[in-house]
Amino acid sequence: MKKALKILAVALLLAATVIPVQAQRRVVHYLPKYEQEPYHFGFLLAFNEMMYTVKTVENYQNKIQPANSWPVVNWPTQLFTQSETKCIYVYNIETQQTPGFTVGIIGSKRLGRYFDLRFIPSLSFSERRLDYTLMLEGNNGATYMHKFTKSIGTTFVEFPLNIKYRSKRYNNIGAYVFGGVNPKLDLASQKDNKENINGQEFINNLVTKRFDFAAELGVGFDFYNQWFKMGIEVKMSYGLLDIVKDEAFIYTAPIEKLRNKLFQVSFLFE
């Protein structure tokens, strides 16, 4: 999110320098009838930060994970082997923010003097990460804390539909807020999560459900020039569905609900 905020800060700084300059001289009003046109089209380029919102099972740290749910590859310690392991606990689970990017096509319909309906089919690329800490206890009484990260690659096909409310235009600048919904499909969510070891299949990754439905809110600024309008906006997107697939596995056992969350800085050209 820090990188996205830096990009936003630079964009707002540029906007802050443009406004005083326009106020000090006679301004040519570009695209004066732009808002009166019924339809507008364009494209979007964006930087995003994807993450999860994790709701854990109550007292999950005290629950022993069954042996058939243990990871069987890259056994983390030489203090004792898997067969010498007495039990494993999931000690902690946290989510990481990861950067990505989005491209999309903009379709906008005028609903009224200050209202627009926008449809922006998009492709978003990133990954989500979960940090796990396992506590292993051997039959000999030794314990070992193992930390590792599970990365889930993500390619979202998104269909955001939102209502945009515009302020009154000031010279060649306008502000707006928007809100709406975003059905999305994760093309990478069904990636194979099994590994074959000595003829047996073992689960070795976290897999999420393919479909999600999100609510979105955001704010932005429109900048008009001679040939087109450029917008800079930020939005938060909150997944409404639980996307975890419970496969009786140590990576999913402590998770009661898992939801998508996204922060995005967008540049729109119409």
List PLM regions with ranges.
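Extracellular loop and loop/strand-boundary signature of outer-membrane beta-barrel proteins
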Residues: V28-Y30, I88-I93, T143-K150, E201-V207, ...
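Residues that define the transmembrane beta-barrel architecture of outer-membrane proteins
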Residues: E37-F41, Q97-F101, G153-V157, I173, ...
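Outer-membrane beta-barrel channels and translocator barrels
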Residues: Q36, G112-Y114, K168-N172, Y224-Q226, ...
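Residues on the lipid-exposed face of transmembrane beta-strands in outer-membrane beta-barrel proteins
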Residues: F43-F47, F101-K109, P121-L123, V157-Y165, ...
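Predominantly the C-terminal beta-signal and adjacent terminal strand-loop region
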Residues: R210-A215, F221-E270
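Short glycine/proline- and aromatic-enriched beta-strand/turn motifs that initiate or cap beta-hairpins
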Residues: A23-P99, E270
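Structural signature of outer-membrane beta-barrel domains
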Residues: N48-Y52, S124-R128, N182-A188, S237-I243, ...
